[in-house]
Amino acid sequence: VRDLVAFLSSLGRLPEFTIKPDQIIARRWQTLAATPQAAHAITRTSIKTAAQEHPDFVWQTAYSSVSGSLPLSEVPHMHSRYGLKPGDLGASYVRTYLEVLQPGRAKLQIEPSKGVSVWIGETPYDPATSPEIDWTAGPQKITLAIDRDAAGSGPLSLRVVAPAEKGALIKAVGGK
């Protein structure tokens, strides 16, 4: 109880317990349940299948912490690729949604960057080689395939950074 009171009294006062309104951070995620059917669908095709709608996929809602990070240790992982050794974690699949209110340029900052494949809709996106995107207005689905053996079990975060000029106006979709 004492820890809960200390935590609640820190909300909004300490930087790690403060939500900054000028930052666009994904806070609501959907994680792909680690079912045998989902693992089979991805293994049979490729990891890009996670960016598509598939009848064997069951997505569950997860929320990031106040700091904007989603602990990967709490995200389901599955053996959905060949060549895994005993003890390998395999991969996790998550998605989030952004609403582009005004078209323009912006980039995604994703941590960890190692071992993460990204799709905007069903189009592959490599933050390292093409950091800025020309966004069109409307809802955008961002899907991540995370190689857990490369990325580890630390926190996952996705931030949107728009330049001051010709930048897109984007908000992260929240709610339940």
Give the residues covered by each predicted segment:
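Aromatic-lined ligand-binding clefts that engage carbohydrates, nucleic acids, or primary amines
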Residues: 99-100, 104-118, 142
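Short, well-structured beta-strand segments within conserved domains
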Residues: 106-110, 133-148
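Short strand-edge motifs at loop-to-beta-strand transitions and within beta-strands
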Residues: 94-96, 129-133, 140
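Short beta-strands within extracellular/lumenal beta-sheet-rich domains
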Residues: 86-99
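Accessory carbohydrate-binding/adhesion or oligomerization-edge regions at the termini
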Residues: 5-80, 145-176
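Solvent-exposed beta-strand/loop surfaces of large extracellular or lumenal domains
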Residues: 77-82, 117-133
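A mature extracytoplasmic/lumenal domain signature
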Residues: 112-114, 122-124, 146-148
